[in-house]
Amino acid sequence: RPAPFLIHQESNVIVRAFRDYLRQDIGEILIDNPKVLELARQHIAALGRPDFSSKIKLYTGEIPLFSHYQIESQIESAFQREVRLPSGGSIVIDSTEALTAIDINSARATRGGDIEETAFNTNLEAADEIARQLRLRDLGGLIVIDFIDMTPVRHQRAVENRLREAVRQDRARIQISHISRFGLLEMSRQRLSPSLGESSHHVCPRCSGTGTVRDNESLSLSILRLIEEEALKENTQEVHAIVPVPIASYLLNEKRSAVNAIETRQDGVRCVIVPNDQMETPHYHVLRVRKGEETPTLSYMLPKL
């Protein structure tokens, strides 16, 4: 056959859903589109599962299907770093290159008459929610869970068993260790596909994925040192610092004397601070202009990088 031609095509979302999630304990399958309903019944027939045919039903309610069953809120929770628990506690999920860390906080949890009982109940709730979030986010690899400290060993074993029971319906292979003396539980989950974060998020262009940026004062001082380094080089005529507006304000006001001192020490070197309203911290650009190079006389005519 002449190239190019199709070698393989992944099944559509209906086929994949039935293939991956069809289980005997499913009570009904609701579909809000008649055409999709017919395709689903055809696929069930092709699978030789007539027992599921009667479970496939057309949803005709006026409220959208996902809103009626509060699925939208569950989907949104999969995109949140913090997930609330029924008792008022929460779990915080952070993924790194090496592992996924999950921290349980009692926060406003008030159930129970003492701290130990509150910790135990919150950890039980967290075990159920963690199992659900692992499936929703399709998190794989090494996962470390920091449970709230519990003194009785029986409580630790109960939380471990609750987690094992909660992940039974997960189609990925899962291994779970015991809670250590530091309150940490390590587990691994088979990576079936890219996680929700990998497939639907991109790295923040401002912080480059770190989650934090340097404050204005710290960054300004760093840029000031870099300006001085460039000014010290031989044959330097000018040093241009193209920076965000807050950084320019700090350098031109709080550090005006320091900029003037650099120009005084390096006789003949001109330091030019150019505010760029399109630039955000921590981004900046310091440019050294050698003697003899042509540059615009006016700073506002400098290119905005």
Feature locations, PLM:
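DE-rich acidic low-complexity regions and acidic surface loops
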Residues: 1-305
